[in-house]
Amino acid sequence: MTRDGTTAPMGTADLHLHTLASDGTAGVVEILEHVDANTDLDLIAITDHDRIDAAVAARAIARDRGLRAEVIVGEEVSSLGGHVLALFVEERIRPLRTLSATIAEIHGAGGIAIPAHPLVPYPLCAQGWVLRRLLDDPDPAARPDGLETFNPTSLGKPWHRRVVRFADDNGLAHVGNSDAHALADIGQGWTTFPGRTAAELRHAIETGTTEHGGTFHETAGQLGTFGNQLRKRGRDARDEVAGRVRRDGTGRDHGYPGGRLRPPRYETEADPGTGERR
């Protein structure tokens, strides 16, 4: 309730979307136009795998066009302990480090860390024992800010209640997302929060006042999306071999250099442990 006794507005966000820059099947402009015309989302986050160039481009395009939904820059970081969403970041987070080091780097960059599709017995998912170790770590920088308590994939459906219970037991914010790799999937999972803006969403995650919602995929629909992803990967591999970078709305055609496999800022970073270039 607000001070005058009225109910505060509730916003809706989908904070896990992929574009053609990683393994999604739609470009930045397509996604923005779809969100504007076909959803009631107030916020979206572009979270390609281990890169932020398309997310930065999406934010700029949305602002320039005056689109309704605000864009948060993010990425889905590949850590050794599972995938984690980095939200509100302005630089890439180094991949393939421990989950605790990854989360600490996200926080050091001013971001929020949300383990994606956790507890599912799959190599890309943070397991309970790993998360419990982080929660017991005396360094608060290693603690996640919430959990992706709803992800519509049918693979994770059997573990959904367990994830919700884990978040509740450990005081972690609920975050629901679509993990969309196709336009039709955007908004199939969502997060509701008091307010409408990105700043209000961030405050809600930090104070644990978010809620998740969504509808699980049917297996047949997911198989269709996987088929499209495989065809897209084949085209990407062909273009890499041919030395071409396609101008397909990924963000690279908005002035961001680098091929699909070597995103910007990767080549110039040093390993923090050895000082050697990677």
Give the label of every model feature segment.
Residues 43-47, 148-149:
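Short catalytic-loop micro-motif centered on adjacent basic/acidic residues
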Residues 71-79:
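A short, structured active-site edge motif that brings together acidic residues
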Residues 40-41, 67, 109-112:
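Loop/turn elements at helix/coil->beta-strand transitions in domains of secreted/extracellular proteins
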Residues 114-124:
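Aromatic-lined carbohydrate-recognition surfaces of secreted/lumenal glycan-active proteins
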Residues 50:
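Acidic, metal/ion-coordinating pockets
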Residues 1-38, 53-59, 66, 78-93, ...:
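Charged catalytic cores and adjacent phosphate/nucleic-acid-binding surfaces used
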Residues 15, 47, 75, 116, ...:
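Active-site flanking residues adjacent to catalytic metal/cofactor-binding acidic residues
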